[in-house]
């Protein structure tokens, strides 16, 4: 299993990244192939559910598609931010935004801000 490492002090966290890995966590016993298959299924599900807006994902869970893109880069994918977002969105991020993203409401922005305070 790939070991997560702590970023240098002062490095910004992505969607409140938590790199504290507890070896006793059952998640750490998952085979990497199984974990990768589940991750790919999640990404494909989010590609299909473009009606689930990133702002709503942030408001409910404190992460979104863009966070997933950041996380694959932080995990070592040799991609820049734009390429990583294209992998997750299934198309360039600008195209995804133009086709599917709606204007965020003040309520959505407030939910996101409150949700982010609960991230580790």
Predicted features along the sequence, with ranges:
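Domain-level signature for proteins that mediate thiol-based redox and metal-cofactor handling
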Residues: 2-120
